[in-house]
From Swiss-Prot:
GO terms for biological process: DNA replication, Okazaki fragment processing. It comes from Shewanella amazonensis (strain ATCC BAA-1098 / SB2B). Binds 2 Mg(2+) per subunit. Only one magnesium ion has a direct interaction with the protein, the other interactions are indirect. SUPFAM superfamilies: 5' to 3' exonuclease, C-terminal subdomain, PIN domain-like. The lineage of its organism: Bacteria, Pseudomonadati, Pseudomonadota, Gammaproteobacteria, Alteromonadales. Its EC number is 3.1.-.-. Its cofactor is Mg(2+); K(+). Residues 185-190 are annotated as: Interaction with DNA. It comes from the Bacteria. This is Flap endonuclease Xni. Mg(2+) binds at D105. Keywords: DNA-binding, Endonuclease, Hydrolase, Magnesium, Metal-binding, Nuclease, Potassium. Belongs to the Xni family. Pfam families: 5_3_exonuc, 5_3_exonuc_N. Residues 162-251 form the 5'-3' exonuclease domain.
């Protein structure tokens, strides 16, 4: 069975870089990133491996909603300068770079879903909880820094929803980390309670007459924001990749 290890490049590198005593020490950064990659390869024994990098183009999500990810800290200058050399060095480790035009998430999602559709296993290495919408028997998410797979049941319990309701949940209450707005006046607690009762966003909107007038009005007036938020949160899984699985093969030696 094919097993594809998909590393969220900047998610890994920026966290390692943030822990360095000297942010300009690119040699130490490379050593630590290389050490992390070797550990991931040893631990998961993939047949194929890709490290996916964010690109510089403005995301389609930003074009759709100007405030998307507004306020995010820019990449430190030293890291931005050293990143091209770091990518080149990593190629010697059987970690094959895949460069996205803008956000890496949609490329990660496409790679994972295409492999899962053939019966293979995809392991995504990232702490980005937005990727949890992809989880299935064939797709799992590994937190390198915690040294464990994400506990989906604990995540569901924390939010008070089931995994398949994640996008509907974000449509209702938004995602503050990515500046996805949600519906004004609907918070996480209300969102989880509504989904527990009505099971889906579609059912909820078909049942507005069963709600109190105040909450029904919020939902009615916020319908467009819910649609927008759902679209912003949903990962694309059918992007053209311009590569073959064999391009990502790990040297068995």
């Amino acid at each position: 069975m094919n097993r594809l290890l998909i590393i969220d490049g900047l998610n890994l590198v920026r966290r390692i870089h943030a822990a360095l005593p000297d942010e300009g020490d690119m040699d130490t950064l490379y050593d630590r990133v290389a050490q992390a990659c070797r550990k991931l390869l040893r631990g998961h024994q993939p047949t194929h491996c890709a490290i996916v990098w964010d690109g510089d183009a403005i995301s389609w999500r930003k074009h759709l909603y100007e405030d998307y990810k507004k306020g995010r800290k820019p990449m430190p200058e030293a890291l931005a300068k050293g990143l091209p050399a770091l990518k080149t060095k990593l190629e010697t480790l059987d970690v094959h770079s895949v460069n996205a035009d803008s956000e890496a998430d949609d490329i990660i999602a496409t790679l994972a879903c295409k492999l899962a559709a053939t019966g293979g296993e995809a392991i995504i290495v990232s702490t980005d909880k937005g990727l949890l919408q992809l989880m299935s028997p064939h797709i799992r998410q590994w937190d390198h820094f915690a040294g464990q797979f994400f506990d989906i049941e604990a995540f569901e319990a924390k939010l008070g929803i089931e995994r398949h309701q994640l996008l509907d949940y974000i449509a209702l209450c938004g995602d503050s980390g990515n500046k996805i707005p949600g519906i004004p006046g609907i918070g996480p607690k209300s969102a989880s309670e509504l989904l527990r009762t009505y099971r889906s966003l579609a059912n909820l909107y078909h049942s507005l007459g069963t709600l109190g007038s105040r909450q029904a009005n919020k939902l009615r007036e916020g319908r467009d924001m819910a649609r927008l938020s759902y679209k912003l949160a949903k990962l694309q899984t059918e992007l053209p990749l311009h590569l073959k699985l064999s391009d990502l093969r790990v040297n068995p030696s």
